[in-house]
């Protein structure tokens, strides 16, 4: 069993840091931003923008967005803007409970185009080379009707006089990082509720959680987040190893009583990758490792061996 290290003072400091961490703030530099090289090579400061020929109210529109974000961001979304490049934003979204993304951190780089708000913002997802959602590509593309990268009804698309950056970020969290992302794939929603569809959905969600375990002006926030959430993540992994279905865990334990069980492949993947997760938490000073689960589960061990053997055979 993985135990939590008795470091109440450190944990308290981390919790206080997260509590005081501003949901919206400005930074001095965005040189590592995905869109940093786009636009004018000159710094897009408020002073420079007066001479760049952009729409008259472009600066005011962006400043208005800043104010909306500053006042209305939910507890699970954090945004950083840059005063020297006011066209750029960076956001981190915390995966919601009840989804395969729970406790994960998902980063997005955003740019206000020169013709904003007549056109929607550009959004790039930092995927780490992993496909964790039908709407989030490995290359960083985000498919969402609100930003015109996917089809949608009129009210689902960007409306220059109504749509906001806050709406965009909340939409990514609610519509993309949702409970059953499998059905985000076009056409798959027709199988929702059917035995085959639910089976595929469960497999997809299990893979999403494992990928999320593998994943910028938020460095201290990230360290503190995972320090504080380490107990919940380890508890979830232990429950998943025992067969709990993915997304059924909250801070109080298994919240959904169901006959469904996590697949054997999922349990094996979590068991295998948990060593890496635990090592990172140990390095972070959040936990100490006594034993992942006492004696190894013979069923899991034997199945893991045969899966590994099959992988070797297929690769020859």
From Swiss-Prot:
Query: Which keywords annotate this record?
Result: ATP-binding, Nucleotide-binding, Transferase, Ubl conjugation pathway
The family database entries (SUPFAM superfamilies) matched by this protein are listed as: UBC-like
Give me the segments passing through the membrane: none
Enzyme Commission code: 2.3.2.23
Active site: which residues? 143 (glycyl thioester intermediate)
Query: Is Nucleotide-binding found in the keyword set?
Result: yes
Q: Which reaction does this enzyme catalyse, per its entry?
A: S-ubiquitinyl-[E1 ubiquitin-activating enzyme]-L-cysteine + [E2 ubiquitin-conjugating enzyme]-L-cysteine = [E1 ubiquitin-activating enzyme]-L-cysteine + S-ubiquitinyl-[E2 ubiquitin-conjugating enzyme]-L-cysteine
Q: A single Gene Ontology molecular function, please?
A: ATP binding
Q: In which pathway does it act?
A: Protein modification; protein ubiquitination
InterPro entries the UniProt entry points to: UBQ-conjugat_E2_core, UBQ-conjugating_enzyme/RWD
GO BP term, example:
protein ubiquitination
Q: Which Pfam families match?
A: UQ_con (PF00179)
What task does this protein carry out?
Accepts the ubiquitin from the E1 complex and catalyzes its covalent attachment to other proteins.
Q: Its family? A: Belongs to the ubiquitin-conjugating enzyme family.
Name of the protein described by the UniProt record = Putative ubiquitin-conjugating enzyme E2 39
